[in-house]
């Protein structure tokens, strides 16, 4: 598979220093500050999102000003004066604007992200590049001067949480806060919620995917307040767990979130949300969260919302809603498909995780503006195209390989499976989080019925029909409908697949991952882990043995010997053995 990532250029000026080039930014790094080149896609996507956010924010402010002007004219009863909308201002990247965005990068490290923001985002007033490490702040200062962006970037040496708590006054708040920590971002969310303006943009990265994917549910509950389940859709579940965590922090201050874009890529997840103030909207948060039941046998999942809303129109408020608590549980004590019991996980965010209008604006900007020269532009287009095709009202997904594994069946080809679902009258899509995903509004009973129909063509070995197994329980039932596998549905093959877009790319380098703290992960300064750990135990034992030999060969009292034989340490007597 073709890889479209452009590798950063590295110029070694001395043994302890590298100059890293990414787009127009140059970073001087001596190996003491964290830099990870694999997150270029993350940085490119963030730059594109902030540019689109600034455009939308400018439009919203213009509309708000026009509405205020019309109200003022109406109060004055001046019919001759008609407010004329002003043309939106034109911004250029690299120039300071007093009415521009104020951005905080709370964990800046080398300052690469902030420098790229200053160079590539149009309409910026100030970027605060903060880090707790003195070495990192020194590196930020060096890199700011090296790239000549002193006018736009203000370095800050402070604890990220302290800085955000000290920025809660209206005049000190930020339009956008970028949190890209090493691991879990939960401890920074509380401060971020308080230092954002109304309608501000929060950009959050989480790299502790092992925790979010269900390997340590107890740790995930401590960090995110949610219990994950080990499922094939674990990457989308990770997105929904993080959104649930962000929403819970927002609700404490009478705020709520609107997810614009939620991406699972490589070894991390990246979320873009707008944070608004509104007590009435906060009440809807309960209905946006759900528990999830997962069968321990066939792994069928069912969602149980925490709250429900019903229309309750009145003369004064036709849009009024009534809030209620749903009845439950949503499943029986035993699975209706295979008879096994259930695991309970969550709560997770069960509302849409993308804003289709924002995604469309972002896709247009990446294809038609100066953003089309981004290093990972081709991959961004592919991922956003898949996001557009996703079913926004269907949380989580199945995978054909896992469904067929439960029934010990030959795997149904993806296009045939999608076609059968579409012919049955349901909707289906991929998820950007997995190339084998099957996101559909078809109930699980229909999916198992399709596989029962498939088993007629590809029978299961009778020896595997063990009583009490999910396989035997599901295949013992008769098919309730006839499903079409041979005639391909016109919508079975999505546009992103037909266009051969870069949807899922292979790892471009060995040991593609989050890297380690405070070190440069490129060049010859650091050997690959596989080489460093070769014969590690043998080398450790050899060094210990050498240390013992050196200790035995060295007399302990030689330094105290003054020439008198009587002062020499006595040698132990050797006993003769028979």
From Swiss-Prot:
Binding site for S-adenosyl-L-methionine: 43, 113, 131
Keyword annotations from UniProtKB, A to Z: Metal-binding, Methyltransferase, RNA-binding, S-adenosyl-L-methionine, Transferase, tRNA processing, tRNA-binding, Zinc
Function: Dimethylates a single guanine residue at position 26 of most tRNAs using S-adenosyl-L-methionine as donor of the methyl groups.
Provenance organism: Drosophila melanogaster (Fruit fly)
Region (Disordered): 63-92, 491-578
Protein name: tRNA (guanine(26)-N(2))-dimethyltransferase
Ranges annotated as biased composition (Basic and acidic residues): 564-578
GO molecular function: tRNA (guanine(26)-N2)-dimethyltransferase activity; tRNA binding
Catalytically driven reaction(s): guanosine(26) in tRNA + 2 S-adenosyl-L-methionine = N(2)-dimethylguanosine(26) in tRNA + 2 S-adenosyl-L-homocysteine + 2 H(+)
Coiled coil spans: none
């Amino acid at each position: 598979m073709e890889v479209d990532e452009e590798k950063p250029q590295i110029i070694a000026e001395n043994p302890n220093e590298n100059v890293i080039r990414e787009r127009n930014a140059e970073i001087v790094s001596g190996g003491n500050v964290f830099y990870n080149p694999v997150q270029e896609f993350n940085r490119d996507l963030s730059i594109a999102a902030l540019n689109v956010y600034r455009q939308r924010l400018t439009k919203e402010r213009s509309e708000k000003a026009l509405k205020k002007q019309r109200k003022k004219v109406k109060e004055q009863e001046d019919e001759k004066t008609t407010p004329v909308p002003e043309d939106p201002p034109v911004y250029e990247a690299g120039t300071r604007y007093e009415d521009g965005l104020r951005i905080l990068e709370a964990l800046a490290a080398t300052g690469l992200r902030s420098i790229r923001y200053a160079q590539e985002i149009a309409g910026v007033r100030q970027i605060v590049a903060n880090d707790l490490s003195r070495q990192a702040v020194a590196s930020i200062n060096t890199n700011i001067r090296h790239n000549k962006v002193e006018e736009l970037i203000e370095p800050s040496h402070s604890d990220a949480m302290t800085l955000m708590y000290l920025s809660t006054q209206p005049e000190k708040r930020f339009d956008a806060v970028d949190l890209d920590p090493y691991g879990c971002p939960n401890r920074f969310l509380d401060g971020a919620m308080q230092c954002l303006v109304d309608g501000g943009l929060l950009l959050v990265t989480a790299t502790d995917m092992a925790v979010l994917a269900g390997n340590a549910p107890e740790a995930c509950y401590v960090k995110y307040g949610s219990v994950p389940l080990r499922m094939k859709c674990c990457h989308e579940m990770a997105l929904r767990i993080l959104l649930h965590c962000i929403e819970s922090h927002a609700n404490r201050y009478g705020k709520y979130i609107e997810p614009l874009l939620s991406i699972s890529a490589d070894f991390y997840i990246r979320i873009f949300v707008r944070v608004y103030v509104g007590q009435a909207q906060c009440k809807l948060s309960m209905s946006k969260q759900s528990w999830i039941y997962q069968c321990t046998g066939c792994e069928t999942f069912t969602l149980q919302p925490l709250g429900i809303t019903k229309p309750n129109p009145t003369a004064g408020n036709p849009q009024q809603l009534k809030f209620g608590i749903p009845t439950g549980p949503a499943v029986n004590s035993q699975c209706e498909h295979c008879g096994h019991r259930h695991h309970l996980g969550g709560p997770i965010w069960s509302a849409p995780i993308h804003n289709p209008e924002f995604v469309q604006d972002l896709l247009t900007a990446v294809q038609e503006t100066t953003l089309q020269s981004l290093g990972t532009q081709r991959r961004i287009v592919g991922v956003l195209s898949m996001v557009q095709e996703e079913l926004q009202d269907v949380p989580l997904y199945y995978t054909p390989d896992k469904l067929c594994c439960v029934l010990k069946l030959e795997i149904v080809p993806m296009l045939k499976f999608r076609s059968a679902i579409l012919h049955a009258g349901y909707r289906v899509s991929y998820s950007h989080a997995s190339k084998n995903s099957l996101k559909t509004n078809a109930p699980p009973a229909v999916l198992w019925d399709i596989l029962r129909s498939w088993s007629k063509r590809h029978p299961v070995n009778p020896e595997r029909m063990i009583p009490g197994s999910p396989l035997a329980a599901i295949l013992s039932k008769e098919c309730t409908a006839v499903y079409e596998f041979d005639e391909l549905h016109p919508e079975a093959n999505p546009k992103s697949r037909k266009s051969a877009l870069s949807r899922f790319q292979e790892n471009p380098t060995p040991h593609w991952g989050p890297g380690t703290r405070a070190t440069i992960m490129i060049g010859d300064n650091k050997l690959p882990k596989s080489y460093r750990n070769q014969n590690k135990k043998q080398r450790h034992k050899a060094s210990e043995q050498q240390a013992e030999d050196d200790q035995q060969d060295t007399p302990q009292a030689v330094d105290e010997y003054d020439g008198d034989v009587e002062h020499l340490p006595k040698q132990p007597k050797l006993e003769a053995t028979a």
